[in-house]
Amino acid sequence: ITIIDNSFSSIGRAVMWGRSLYQNIQRFLLFQLTVNVAACFIVLIGAFMGTESPLTVTQMLWVNLIMDTFAALALASLPPSAMVMKEKPRSREANIITKPMMWQIFGVGIFFVLLMFGLVQYFKHADVTSLADFSFAEYFKNYFNFKASQGISALEQTYIFTIFVFLQFWNLFNAKAFHSEGSAFKGLFRKDVIAGFGLALFVIVAGQLLIVSFGGEMFNVAAMSAKDWMYIVLGTLPVFIIGEAMRMVKKL
């Protein structure tokens, strides 16, 4: 290590930046692997059931852009935190994917899979033209209904696709808060965070809006009403709320 200003404070800053970068990489892996677990299992279940894939190839391409490009932009741009200096030194043999990360990856990923599987089953056996008509009773009734179905319409496919994207959108906040021991809102409105994390969030929402509105046959989607957008945003919000609640409990 080179002391550039004849002071050991430069070494401290270098360690802080190094630890913060390591945590940002962990956050990115946490988010990316959670999406991978969910997307892979959803597609595999559709294949084993002999039905059309819940997510089309072009839709998966957009999900991959969110997972790789925008998530990397959002999480890699998070500024260093002095809190990392309070942590114990890490062993060279330590795995970058820790046990808490593994639990969160598979726990959240499998939850997303179970939720999306239920939605696919529901839309296969119900003729849905608006999410205002969504019935939890029918959702659970059709969960294990493997009888011949009427298939999934373009609008219902759009619901599945958009719900999946917004599940990842809110989970991106949980990935940001990983290791921070605080709210995902902490430092969210700093200029450097807005320039990276905020921009990525905007691109995800704006991109999804444009795809649903103008994607048509290319993405196998249909335009949704403003109410449907509201239901999806609010319906997927508990992913973030539960994450915030769990972080608050850990602080107690």
Residue ranges with predicted function:
Residues S225-V239:
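Small-residue-rich transmembrane alpha-helices that serve as helix-helix interface/gating elements
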Residues F144-G151, K186-G187, S213-K227:
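Aromatic-capped, Gly/Pro-kinked transmembrane alpha-helices
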Residues I97, M101, E181-V203:
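C-terminal membrane-solvent junction of multi-pass transporters and transport-like membrane proteins
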Residues I1-G182:
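Membrane-embedded transport module
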Residues Q168-L172, F240-R247:
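Alpha-helical transmembrane segments
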Residues L44-S53, Q121, Q208-S225:
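Transmembrane helix-loop junctions at the membrane interface of multipass transporters and ion channels
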Residues A126, A177, A245-L252:
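Membrane-interface capping segments at transmembrane-helix boundaries
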Residues W103-M116, I163-L167, I194-V212, G235-L237:
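Hydrophobic membrane-spanning alpha-helices of multi-pass integral membrane proteins
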